[in-house]
């Protein structure tokens, strides 16, 4: 859909302030546009009545979604849509208030009311379906085992989650088929979720929205196990092939069994199937639903439900097993530790890259610390900005500054040509250096795939030198080595663990010449162990423990799609 010639999109200021009264006392609300809400290549998908898929790329340079605070209240927060009047919530003196326009003709009057005065459809406690004994996708270490080094604290940047939301047909029906209303609500929810995760030093950017306006693409059932697995499989085999993203959630109008209103896999962020959650759209209050969305995404980041020893001050915490009567947007100390433990130990690589401004579909907001369309920099709110190069109020560079962001920016100037900006990760990955003409580090370049490495023990593959010894060490630790060739014959069985690849869900046994491109076998010589054919297998992730692509399987040969092929023709 294109805008008619001459039509002008409404202009929403980067920063605004409003004055009104709460409990008879004047308050000043300061708002800053959330410029990291949408990516530049944000796309929306819905379906025509005849079933055709319709993809649009709405303009996102200007939008009306803001974060903010109340003047003279350091603990205050706000998440507001200013599209048609002010709609959203703010916290003032530890109380949650909602604001929305009164539906009166020719009037700009608004209603302000406390959360406790909102009519609630059902007072029964609502809860997440994940139980404490529910098996993690990856084990989470005890909090006492986590320790950040000074180097890690210095160089660990913000993480960026490219978020995709899918809305089921039941939600479309509940909203009388009004797609614009649904989109506006999804933007408001994403704005709140992004604000919540900033407390964990993460940014959540909406990169896509799909509305099942002509029928669900999976069978959505009250059984959360069934629906979560179905959505995860659809995401892996369908959605990911069409749109790059890190994490997806299904928002559904169906009433899940029992008091459950959300469900997700634990420790699965970046997994092609399991980086998902499902959320019941059970409340008309955006804050309530956004907290559930943040809660389920927290599980994907390795965070378990809070126990009695966890705290986030005097507020209820995001990861409590039940949804509080007055939900807050704070993660507990336990959540922070578990999240960063998961990131540091399991390295979910998809959340390292900052999304292109063109990837974020929600409208840009100045002050959300995401660099988006129209911004030269974004260092957060004026109160929190610690970037001397950036004007936080406008998201423009200060006079005399060449840059305010990037690995090749030092003291607001481009780094000198030749300055190393990305270290070598292996002999197959040379270091990159600044050009002196840009604040960004040049693209990561690798040596050619198939080039010999590690004294001919391996061949370069996508910047790494994969060899079986290193893979055994990663799985089992020290004193573990590549097993004898006889162990690999088990891969000819085609059973639950011994195979070379999967085709249409079926495990294909290895041909004799391909056995070293299936399950990895290691010889364990560690104290108390004497296992000549040790292997790793997990129902949660069947692929883990397989020989990695590009690994040397014979002289002059490497693994490719479960075959041991000539390195000269593999790439």
Curated annotation (Swiss-Prot):
For the ligand (Ca(2+) 2), the binding residues are 365, 368, 370, 372, 375, 378
Just give the chief location class. secreted
Cited PROSITE patterns? ADAM_MEPRO, DISINTEGRIN_1, DISINTEGRIN_2, ZINC_PROTEASE
Q: How is its activity regulated?
A: Inhibited by EDTA, 1,10 phenanthroline and batimastat (a peptidomimetic MMP inhibitor).
> Which residues are part of the propeptide segment?
1-150
Q: What is its EC number?
A: 3.4.24.73
Q: Where in the cell is it found?
A: Secreted
Q: Which parts of the sequence bind Zn(2+)?
A: 295, 299, 305
Q: Does the keyword Transcription regulation apply?
A: no
Could you give one GO CC term from the UniProt record? plasma membrane
Its EC top class is: hydrolase
Entry-listed glycosylation sites: 333
Cofactor binding, note field: Binds 1 zinc ion per subunit.
Catalytic reactions of this protein: Cleavage of 10-His-|-Leu-11, 14-Ala-|-Leu-15, 16-Tyr-|-Leu-17 and 24-Phe-|-Phe-25 bonds in insulin B chain
**Per its UniProt entry, which superkingdom is the organism in?**
Eukaryota
Residue list for modification Pyrrolidone carboxylic acid (Glu) = 151
Q: Which residues cross the membrane?
A: none
Residues the record lists as binding Ca(2+) 3:
429-430, 432, 444-445
Q: Which UniProt keywords apply?
A: Apoptosis, Calcium, Cell adhesion impairing toxin, Disulfide bond, Fibrinogenolytic toxin, Glycoprotein, Hemorrhagic toxin, Hemostasis impairing toxin, Hydrolase, Metal-binding, Metalloprotease, Platelet aggregation activating toxin, Platelet aggregation inhibiting toxin, Protease, Pyrrolidone carboxylic acid, Secreted, Toxin, Zinc, Zymogen
Q: Which InterPro entries match?
A: ADAM_Cys-rich, Disintegrin_CS, Disintegrin_dom, Disintegrin_dom_sf, MetalloPept_cat_dom_sf, Peptidase_M12B, Peptidase_M12B_N, Reprolysin_adamalysin
Enumerate the cofactors the protein uses: Zn(2+)
Specify which residues bind Ca(2+) 1 according to the UniProt entry for this protein. Answer: 162, 246, 350, 353
- Give the note: The metalloproteinase domain which is released from the cleavage of jararhagin-C is apparently unstable.
Q: Subunit structure of this entry?
A: Monomer (Jararhagin and Jararhagin-C) and dimer (Jaracetin).
Q: What does this protein do?
A: Snake venom zinc metalloproteinase-disintegrin-like jararhagin: causes hemorrhage. This is the result of the degradation of sub-endothelial matrix proteins leading to the disruption of the blood vessel endothelium, with accompanying disturbances in platelet function. It is able to degrade von Willebrand factor (vWF) and it hydrolyzes the alpha-chain of fibrinogen (FGA) while leaving the beta and gamma chains unaffected.
The protein in question is named Zinc metalloproteinase-disintegrin-like jararhagin
Q: What species was this sequence derived from?
A: Bothrops jararaca (Jararaca)
């Amino acid at each position: 859909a294109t805008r008619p010639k001459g039509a002008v999109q409404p202009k929403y200021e980067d920063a605004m302030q409003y004055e009104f009264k709460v409990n008879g006392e004047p308050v000043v609300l300061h708002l800053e546009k959330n410029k990291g809400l949408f990516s530049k290549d944000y796309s929306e998908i819905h379906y025509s009545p005849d079933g055709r898929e319709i993809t649009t790329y709405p303009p996102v340079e200007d939008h009306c979604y803001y974060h903010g605070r109340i003047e003279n209240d350091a603990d205050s927060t706000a998440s507001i849509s200013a599209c048609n009047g002010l709609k959203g919530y703010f916290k003032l003196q530890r109380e949650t208030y909602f604001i929305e326009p009164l539906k009166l003709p020719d009037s700009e009057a608004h209603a302000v009311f406390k959360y406790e005065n909102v009519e609630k459809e059902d007072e029964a406690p609502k809860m997440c379906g994940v139980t404490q004994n529910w098996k993690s996708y990856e084990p989470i270490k005890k909090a006492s085992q986590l320790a950040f080094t000074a180097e890690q604290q210095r160089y660990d940047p913000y993480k960026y989650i490219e978020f995709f939301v899918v809305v089921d047909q039941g939600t479309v029906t509940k909203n009388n088929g009004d797609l614009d209303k649904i989109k506006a609500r999804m933007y408001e929810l994403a704005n709140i979720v992004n604000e919540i995760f900033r407390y964990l030093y993460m940014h959540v950017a909406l990169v896509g929205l799909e509305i099942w306006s002509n029928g669900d693409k999976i069978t959505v059932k009250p059984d959360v196990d069934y629906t979560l697995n179905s959505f995860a499989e659809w995401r892996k085999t369908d959605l990911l092939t069409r749109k790059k993203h890190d994490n997806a959630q299904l928002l559904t109008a169906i009433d899940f069994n029992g008091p459950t209103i959300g469900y997700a896999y634990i420790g699965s962020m970046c997994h092609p199937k399991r980086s998902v959650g499902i959320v019941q759209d059970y409340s008309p209050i955006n804050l309530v639903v956004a907290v559930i969305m943040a809660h389920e995404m927290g599980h994907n980041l390795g965070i378990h439900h809070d126990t009695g020893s966890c705290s986030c001050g005097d507020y209820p915490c995001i990861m409590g097993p039940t949804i509080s009567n007055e939900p807050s947007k704070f993660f507990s100390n336990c959540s922070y530790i578990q999240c960063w433990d998961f990131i540091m130990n399991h390295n979910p690589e998809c959340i390292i890259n900052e999304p292109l401004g063109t990837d974020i579909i929600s409208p840009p907001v100045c002050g959300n610390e995401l660099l988006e369309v129209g911004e030269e920099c974004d260092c957060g709110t004026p109160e929190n900005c610690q970037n001397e190069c950036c004007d936080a109020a406008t998201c423009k560079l200060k006079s005399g500054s060449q840059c305010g962001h990037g690995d090749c920016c030092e003291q607001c100037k481009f780094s000198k040509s030749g300055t190393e900006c990305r270290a070598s990760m292996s002999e197959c990955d040379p270091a990159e250096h600044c050009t002196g003409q840009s604040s960004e580090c040049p693209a990561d370049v690798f040596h050619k795939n198939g080039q010999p490495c590690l004294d001919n023990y391996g061949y370069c593959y996508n910047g790494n030198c994969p060899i079986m010894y290193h893979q055994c060490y990663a799985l089992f630790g020290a004193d573990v080595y590549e097993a004898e060739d006889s162990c690999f014959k088990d891969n000819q069985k085609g059973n639950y663990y011994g195979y070379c690849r999967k085709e249409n869900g079926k495990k294909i046994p290895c041909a004799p010449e391909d056995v070293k491109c299936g399950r990895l076998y290691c010889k364990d010589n560690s104290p108390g162990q004497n296992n000549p054919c040790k292997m790793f297998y997990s129902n949660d992730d069947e692929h883990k423990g397989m020989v990695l692509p590009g690994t040397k399987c014979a002289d002059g040969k490497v693994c490719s799609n479960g075959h041991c092929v000539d390195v000269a023709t593999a790439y």
